[in-house]
C-alpha cells in the first residue's frame, strides 16, 4: 500500500489505486495546461510529489525545461523514471538542498492537500528557490458548487479521485489558500481556476447531453467568471518575499 492511500481506509469500499492520477494533457482550461503557462521556458523545476511523472513529462516537453522529481513511493517513482524523469526517492527534506541545488520553480501539482503540514513544506521550499524563483501549485476548491450542493443535502461523501479524494488531509477555498501562502512569506503573483470537465458529475445527464466542445466552453467561462463556485482547482504562482 502506498503511504498516502492508507488515509482512505474507512471512507471507501476499497482503497484508491496509487496510480489513479495520470493521463493529464495540456488542455488550457485544466490545471496541467494552466501550470505549463506559469513555468518559464528553459526553467529548472523541482516537481515535489511527482507521482508517476505524467505532469513532469508534459512540463518537460511543453516548456523545454529540466525537471527533477521527488517521490517517496517506490512504485510511482519507478513509473516516473520510465518516463525519463530524474527522480529522487525521498520526501522534501533540507538535506537535499546541496544535492539538488537551486531551482527556478518548485512545483506542487495536487500535493499540498495531502500533507499534514503544508505551511512547513512551503517554508522549506523557499530554500530550494534561487532569487526570483517561484512556487507553482494546484489545489482543489472545496467550495465548488458540487460540494456546496451535497452539503445542503447533508452529505460529505469521499471519492477515490477529485475534490473529495479520500486521501486529502487539507481542504482549501481561495481565501484559505491565499492565507496559507502569505503566512508562509510568499507574494501571490497569479491565481487561476480550472474548469474540471473531467469530473464525474459532467459525465452523466444532463451534462453528458451537451456536446463536449460546447461544454468545455461553458465550464471554462463559468470558472473564469465565478471561480469560487465553478473552479474545480486553483493554480497559483507565488514568489518568495524578500
Locations of regions flagged by a protein language model:
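Conserved N-terminal segment of class I S-adenosyl-L-methionine
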Residues: 1-105, 119-122, 193-196, 205-206, ...
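Short catalytic micro-motifs in class I SAM-dependent methyltransferases
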Residues: 109-114
